Amino acid sequence: MDLRVFGTVHLIYLAITLPLSVIGLVLAKKYAKSEKAKSIVLKSLGGLLLIWILINRLSQVYRYDQVRWEQIIPDSFCGMTSLVLALAVLFGKKDNAVYHFTWFLGLVGATITVLNPTFLSQGPTVFYLPTISGLLHHSVALVVVVALLMFGQIHITYQKWYCTFFGFTAYLTVGAFQMAVFGFQDSFHIAEPILSGTPLTAWVMAPIYAVGYGMVLLAIELIRRKKQKNRS
């Protein structure tokens, strides 16, 4: 089985999931007009995301010869984002603080991972549970973020910048706890880079992400003000 990035299996996965995602979002946009209908769509997606991230974490718990329940807690930015985003969609209110922290991180992280799933060859087939659940929770997270934006559930504004600061701090706190208490060699790339041979640890990625996110917020704010000016 060709498990290379952009190999046969990866291309087949993209050829199936991307069109289905687009079609699903288009249909949701067309038919989910009421707030109740939008809520049903979003909570269904949130439930699906929660299922896949829990399956992924359980596959890590039982992956080796001994049961390791400490693995139930995600130790990556994407994994934790999938978990907290799913919970926020299921139990949070519109435009909640978690959305403001996770929408951009989820959008960027899920897109990069779906297009470059470096874990694809970790098992004998793509159906190896840690692999397929990893692919699917990233794919569903991407759909969830797009659906939240599409349905106007997030009012993106620079005034909520602090959500990203506190969210990122919380992630690193969890990571430090996992390393100190459970003996993880690394968590949230505190100690090791996301790409081997690069300096891209969390401490390097954080300012890069902050600058990129700040530029996105600035662009959105300028576009919003221009539209308001044109209306007046």
Give a label for each model feature.
Residues 1-42, 47, 53-55:
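N-terminal topogenic module of multi-pass integral membrane proteins
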Residues 2-16, 159-170, 180-218:
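Membrane-interface transmembrane-helix boundary segments in multi-pass integral membrane proteins
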Residues 13-25, 78-90, 137-151, 204-220:
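Hydrophobic cores of alpha-helical transmembrane segments in multi-pass inner/ER membrane proteins
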Residues 29-42, 90-99, 150-162, 226:
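Membrane-interface helix-boundary motifs at transmembrane edges
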Residues 40-44, 72-73, 99-106:
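Cytoplasmic-side transmembrane-helix entry/capping segments in multi-pass membrane proteins
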Residues 55-65, 115-125, 181:
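Juxtamembrane "helix-exit" motif on the non-cytosolic side of transmembrane helices
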Residues 64-98:
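Hydrophobic/aromatic-rich structural module bridging two neighboring secondary-structure elements via a short loop
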Residues 87-151:
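Membrane-proximal helix-loop-helix units in multi-pass membrane proteins
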